[in-house]
Amino acid sequence: MKIKTGGVGFHVAFKVPNNKTQIMESFLDSHENFMRETHHIEGTVEPVVLCYAVLKSPEFNNPLDPSSGETGHTLYGITEIYNGPEGAQAHMVLGQERAEMFAELVKLTNEYCVSGILGAPIIRAMH
């Protein structure tokens, strides 16, 4: 399935001190397992995830110039894209059923989230 306008996505960005990255890595392990166990990559049974990607990079003093040095933080981005609101809603329901993982997400979001785009429409895509 292709990502197209009208789909619905999530993108959450975190800025984590380098000495705390193991907490994020542990969460990402459990989140990836959750995604693999409960989501589909094809078919009609929601949630069908069109994109699940996690990005990680040191935070640079100047992001356009890596030679500027690092800030001592690591940046993470989690991106998920679904066909429409039904898939996004199914994802949220399933995620909240995993109370421990969901509580960890809330804790990490409260501490380290710097940007969150939640359940937003895809407004541009390569068709």
Where are these regions (language model features)?
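Amphipathic protein-protein interaction modules
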Residues: A88, Q96-F102
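Hydrophobic small-molecule pocket/channel-lining residues, especially in calycin-type beta-barrels
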Residues: E104-V106
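Short S/T/G/P-rich N-terminal loop/turn motif that feeds into the first structured element of a domain
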Residues: M1-G77, N83-V93, L108-H127
